[in-house]
């Protein structure tokens, strides 16, 4: 089950919000310090960070920057006071899914969480594909690119100046490493890896 990470230095807020989220059926973890969250939470799973904009030591923007830099698949929804709206909008430009003004009501919260969970699940799938892709050798990556473009084995052999049998061997390895059972699935995986719709905006790229 995806986890909702609730990060706010005000324990009264986290307790009240956690009670609400749990009553809606979500798995919730509460954090009061950004550094503790970054050190202890699983950052590469499907989930959402409900993130307070203003916190001591490491504020919401700092936590969001850290998540972007490490390529986390967690989606971020900011909780803001009225005066923080411009900052929250700026963070959305940097990849946050949404922002909600305090006090938060149920329907907007649930809608934002569902959008964020969809984004996070797609990011997890994309990250798994990227990890598979990173196992390919440079030659296998070149071959995979040609396969995805629809080149036949003989055309690949000519383009790469290798034997057709060598193409067949490399192609089989590419399919195995990319965990693709068919050419169509391999192409879909490359499309997912490249699609901005499956990407949480980060500094981590293949």
Swiss-Prot record:
NCBIfam families: tetrathio_RR
DNA-binding region: 153-172
GO molecular function ontology, one term from the record: transcription cis-regulatory region binding
Encoding gene, per UniProt annotation: ttrR
Top-level taxon in the UniProt lineage: Bacteria
Subcellular location: Cytoplasm
HTH luxR-type domain location: 134-194
Organism: Salmonella typhimurium (strain LT2 / SGSC1412 / ATCC 700720)
Cited SUPFAM superfamilies: CheY-like
Protein known as: Tetrathionate response regulatory protein TtrR
Gene Ontology terms: cellular component: cytosol; protein-DNA complex
PTM per Swiss-Prot/TrEMBL: Phosphorylated by TtrS.
Stretches assigned to the Response regulatory domain: 3-117
A single GO BP: regulation of DNA-templated transcription
Described function: Member of the two-component regulatory system TtrR/TtrS, which is required for synthesis of tetrathionate reductase. Positively regulates transcription of the ttrBCA operon. During mice infection, the ability to use tetrathionate as an electron acceptor is a growth advantage for S.typhimurium over the competing microbiota in the lumen of the inflamed gut.
UniProt keyword terms in alphabetical order: Activator, Cytoplasm, DNA-binding, Phosphoprotein, Transcription, Transcription regulation, Two-component regulatory system
Major site of localization recorded for this protein: cytoplasm
4-aspartylphosphate, modified sites: 52
UniProt xrefs under InterPro entries: CheY-like_superfamily, Sig_transdc_resp-reg_receiver, Tetrathionate_resp_reg, Tscrpt_reg_LuxR_C, WH-like_DNA-bd_sf
Alphabetical list of Gene3D superfamilies matching this protein: 3.40.50.2300, Winged helix-like DNA-binding domain superfamily/Winged helix DNA-binding domain
